[in-house]
């Protein structure tokens, strides 16, 4: 796990463990595309183990013991950051999943909502970059290199701007979709993700 900031560490040390009889709800979010992956519970020991090992570890209410996510399946959650809410009684863990999070073999324990599609697309593009399946347009882009990808973003940007001025809504939406897709590919080609851009937008909003 990456080093915690002093402020984050102080906030975690001041958690209110009394409200939930020693247990706090924990929301786990994909650090790269910000999709919610699962909900679990931690006691103080589980949090300490999570921070020390860098792998999300919960307290199982049914088994009454600590359990590290993926301890049997290997589908662990590597911790990137841990934050607390304003009441200090709920945790948000940003992590990078190694394999499906849900025991049903799904990426998330929650069904995908329309608003989460961009996050899912970002994850799919990252997968394409890693696996390079034959016949995939995304694979072709990555193999052509970052200059070609950047060129495509420029082309789609111009086409989107023109559609906004001289074409109808359907054309504007189509060009906007193409632009978003190629922009995510460009971010991935640079080793970045959609979540990085969103985090920057959030920091500017504060």
Curated annotation (Swiss-Prot):
Residues 1-117 are annotated as: Phosphoribosyl-AMP cyclohydrolase. Its main location: cytoplasm. It is found in: Cytoplasm. It catalyses: 1-(5-phospho-beta-D-ribosyl)-ATP + H2O = 1-(5-phospho-beta-D-ribosyl)-5'-AMP + diphosphate + H(+); 1-(5-phospho-beta-D-ribosyl)-5'-AMP + H2O = 1-(5-phospho-beta-D-ribosyl)-5-[(5-phospho-beta-D-ribosylamino)methylideneamino]imidazole-4-carboxamide. NCBIfam families: histidine_hisI, PRK00051.1, PRK02759.1. HAMAP family: HisE, HisIE. This is Histidine biosynthesis bifunctional protein HisIE. The gene is hisI.
